[in-house]
A protein has these predicted regions:
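N-terminal signal-anchor transmembrane segment
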Residues: 1-41, 57-70, 83, 121-134, ...
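Aromatic-anchored transmembrane helix interface
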Residues: 24-32, 49-63, 71-95, 110, ...
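Alpha-helical transmembrane segments of multi-pass inner-membrane proteins
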Residues: 34, 86-89, 99-128, 135-199
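Hydrophobic transmembrane alpha-helices and their immediate junctions
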Residues: 42, 307-349
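Hydrophobic alpha-helical segments of polytopic membrane proteins
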Residues: 48, 148-232, 321, 325, ...
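Long extracytoplasmic/lumenal interhelical loops at the membrane interface
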Residues: 132, 246-308
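Transmembrane alpha-helices of multi-pass inner-membrane enzymes
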Residues: 146-151, 340-353, 357-384
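Flexible juxtamembrane loops connecting transmembrane helices in multi-pass membrane enzymes
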Residues: 205-211, 223-258, 282-285
Length: 384
């Protein structure tokens, strides 16, 4: 935790990429932090837990790529290494019972209020065109990434009214921004949440179907209400949903083909260990494809394959699969964590294929904290 504090203090104080020695120090701290976690497990004679090992491995792969490939000079190393370090840190701190759940929920409440306010302002600016080029994308996705914690808090019977309001506001913002993947994640994720919750509570199929029918009806009512509102505001929600249903990927298929062509043209060593952090973003993403208002491949697996090679994508996919395995174990044991955890896996499933998730430490951060916190509680049976 001390090493992490030093690292982020350094990043705050030096917001420039003109200091190579400082960047070397920042990378070295990440490397040492990862090794210390392994040594701690060995010294305490505790079997290294699979996801912990995979998260450490991912940090080491990112560090190796940035140290070796000088062409991938970056202005923010935390983009790559932050989320696995957050997962490791919150897991270790929670496992040692050094965190108060009440304090965590208070911090999350403040975070949600700030993110909601920020997102509403950006969405209004975007709709009215007050500030040209205003991007509401990442505040919107951050709202989505905080949903698993809201569902978990409600299951713990903490702040139910506030979190219901938060979920409603989040859904309205998704409709206003016409983010198709976000709308689908919310719809499918909440359905999955109710289904798993009904299963672990031992309710019958009829009760589940009735619950889902009411939920779908509520969504349709809200959707049609928003449809008439957005017609007046000249938004394109219905048009964008229609494009999605007709298979229009907004140029993504062309980018995916470009990634595969670039990867196939690489040397064997590059295919194995990758081209370096954000190599595709800075060196292969150009021309007409830049209209996608982003710089990545819009597919985590292809992006990771090009940047970190076969080894990197194998570690990344293995970590994500380990989270799916944990969900199945939670459902099998009828854990109260399982319903909220289900939403996080739905989020993973959609965003890794058609948007951003773990390739940058933005959307995934709160999900990584949620995974580390809840899995430490489950693994060590921590109370209060």
């Amino acid at each position: 935790v001390l090493l992490m504090s030093c690292f982020f203090a350094y990043r705050i104080l030096t917001f420039s990429n003109s200091e190579p020695m400082g960047y070397l120090l920042a990378r070295l701290i990440c490397f040492v932090f990862a090794l210390l976690i392994i040594l701690q497990n060995i010294k305490s004679k505790v079997t290294i837990w699979g996801p912990t090992f995979l998260a450490v491995s991912y940090v080491l792969i990112v560090t190796f790529n940035i140290l070796i490939f000088t062409q991938t000079s970056i202005n923010d190393f935390t983009d790559a290494a932050l989320w696995p370090l957050l997962f490791l840190t919150i897991y270790e701190v929670t496992a040692q019972n050094c965190i108060s759940e009440v304090s965590l929920f208070r911090i999350l409440k403040i975070t949600k209020i700030v993110c909601l306010g920020y997102s509403f302002v950006l969405v209004i600016e975007h709709i009215l065109g007050i500030i040209p080029g205003t991007s509401e994308m990442f505040p919107t996705y951050v709202l989505l990434a905080l949903v698993p914690f809201s569902l978990y808090e409600m299951d713990m019977e903490h702040g139910i009214k506030f979190n219901v309001i938060y979920l409603i506001c989040t859904f309205l913002i998704m409709l206003m921004t016409s983010k198709r993947s976000c709308i689908l994640v919310l719809a499918v994720g909440i359905m999955g949440y109710f289904l798993v919750k009904a299963k672990i509570q031992g309710r019958n199929v009829k009760a589940i179907v009735n619950k889902m029918a009411k939920y779908i009806f509520a969504i349709l009512v809200i959707f049609f209400a928003m449809y008439f509102v957005t017609k007046l505001m000249k938004l394109d929600i219905v048009e964008r949903l229609n494009e999605m249903l007709n298979g229009d990927t907004n140029g993504r298929s062309a980018i995916w083909e470009n990634v595969l062509e670039a990867f196939n043209a690489s040397t064997l060593s590059k295919k194995m260990i990758g081209h370096g952090y954000h190599a595709f973003r800075f060196y292969k993403y150009s021309g007409y494809m830049y209209i996608l208002n982003g710089n990545l491949a819009h597919n985590d697996y292809l992006n990771t394959l090009y940047d970190y090679g076969i080894i990197g994508v194998a570690v990344y996919v293995s970590f994500l699969l380990s989270m799916i395995k944990e969900l199945l174990l939670l459902i099998k044991k009828k854990s109260e964590i399982a319903p909220a955890f289900t939403f996080s896996i739905v989020l993973l499933g959609f965003l890794t294929f058609v948007s951003y998730f773990g390739i940058e430490s933005r959307i995934i951060n709160y999900v990584a904290i949620f995974w580390g916190y809840t899995l430490a509680i489950k693994r060590f049976d921590i109370k209060n």
